[in-house]
């Protein structure tokens, strides 16, 4: 599958590395002024891992969204609402329609106390149905090959089963849940 990872910090870079490792076609997006993206373009590595050459790097959000069947969002939780507003202002909401949106961040919106799935619904409406990827783990452990279990949670059981099948591997065994 074609997977775009939005956010090229430690976890976003890991999600791109992991998706490529299990056979997916991956594009990793970062903002034009991102020091993380600059480092990845220069060395194809950060302090935790080296990206395979087949992962494409971009600072063009349209390109990343257009490319993807699955969009993994791994940005700071407090930046989610402004990022979604930016997408809508640029007319890019239609590029998310019909795609799987996976939130890989934790926490609540600090000023409202709202869950991140609620923030997505408020900003994008009911046309996009996000799921969340959560669980314990450290990038450095995964890169060393230490396996773990994680959860993908959402409302649609069939979609969750499908995502578990697409993303599970000997390194990460996924389970699904409905507790958002």
Roles of regions detected by a PLM:
Residues 49-56, 97, 126-129, 170-172:
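A short helix-to-beta-strand connector/capping loop
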Residues 63-65, 70-147, 160-164:
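Rossmann-like NAD(P)(H) cofactor-binding subdomain of soluble oxidoreductases
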């Amino acid at each position: 599958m074609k997977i775009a990872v939005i956010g090229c910090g430690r976890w976003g870079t890991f999600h791109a590395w992991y998706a490529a490792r299990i056979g997916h076609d991956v594009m990793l997006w970062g903002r034009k002024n991102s020091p993380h993206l600059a480092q990845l373009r220069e060395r194809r590595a950060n302090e935790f891992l080296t990206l395979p050459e087949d992962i494409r790097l971009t600072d063009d959000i349209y390109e990343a969204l257009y490319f993807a069947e699955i969009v993994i969002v791994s940005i700071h939780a407090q930046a989610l609402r402004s990022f979604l507003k930016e997408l809508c202002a640029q007319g890019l909401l239609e590029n998310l329609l019909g795609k799987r949106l996976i939130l890989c961040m934790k926490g609540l919106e600090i000023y409202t106390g709202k869950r991140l799935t609620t923030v997505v619904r408020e900003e994008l409406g009911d046309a996009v149905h996000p799921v969340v990827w959560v669980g314990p783990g450290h990038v450095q452990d995964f890169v060393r090959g230490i396996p773990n279990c994680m959860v993908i949670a959402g409302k649609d059981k069939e979609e969750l089963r499908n995502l578990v099948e697409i993303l599970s591997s000997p390194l990460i065994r996924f389970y699904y849940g409905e507790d958002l």
